[in-house]
Design a protein with these regions (language model features):
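Hydrophobic alpha-helix position signal
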Residues: 11, 36-38
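Short, glycine/acidic-rich hinge or "gate" loops at secondary-structure transitions
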Residues: 12-24, 127
Length: 183
């Protein structure tokens, strides 16, 4: 984490182009809805203070010990923004980091490789061009898009395996917890 933060801070403060890993503050409406849902369980979430993450830790700890509250961590996660890649340095809410990018795995993630290339360019004194800025913006958008597609594919595969497993239980009844309803 320290390497990721240090490189992000250097690149941001020197206004060099790169691909950042960003995580915006929670959407106030979603956080208010979560606070309302959690209230009957005894939790007092202040949606006007999303930076006070200790209030969320209380919910997570409490939900761990009460089967009736098992849905709360899932709903809390749904109220948060998804992390994404961007060519702007806007910080990472979940890590409480003002500067953040992915740097430590250039053989696994393309954004890390770009960060290495842009840092090398900065350290050797090469001039950055509009093409560098455009490439970072496009790579951020494409990396986020591909990450979301991979997540969707993973969810679909999980559903397929669950359905295949549950096929043997057709006709039986089970208790279930509903964590959301979609129309």
């Amino acid at each position: 984490l320290q390497a990721n933060e240090a490189v992000a801070e250097f690149m941001c403060k020197h206004e060099h182009p790169t691909v950042y890993r960003v995580h915006e503050n929670p959407d106030p409406d979603k956080l208010r809805a979560f606070a309302q849902f959690a209230r009957p369980f005894g939790y007092r979430i202040d949606p006007s203070k999303p930076e006070d993450t200790a209030q969320f830790q209380v919910v997570l700890r409490g939900a761990k010990n009460d089967p009736k509250q098992r849905v709360l961590p899932t709903l809390l996660l749904r109220s948060l923004a998804r992390a994404r890649y961007a060519d702007e340095c806007i910080g990472h809410y979940g890590l409480k980091a003002k500067f953040y990018l992915h740097f430590t795995s250039p053989i696994r993630r393309y954004p890390d490789l770009i960060a290495h290339r842009m840092l090398q360019k900065a350290l050797t004194g090469e001039e950055f061009t509009a093409a560098d800025e455009n490439m970072c913006a496009e790579a951020a958008q494409q990396s986020t898009s591909r990450e979301q597609a991979a997540d969707n594919c993973e969810r679909d595969i999980d559903k397929l395996f669950i359905a295949a497993y549950m096929k043997q239980f057709i006709g039986e009844e089970f208790d279930a917890e509903v964590s959301g309803v979609q129309s």
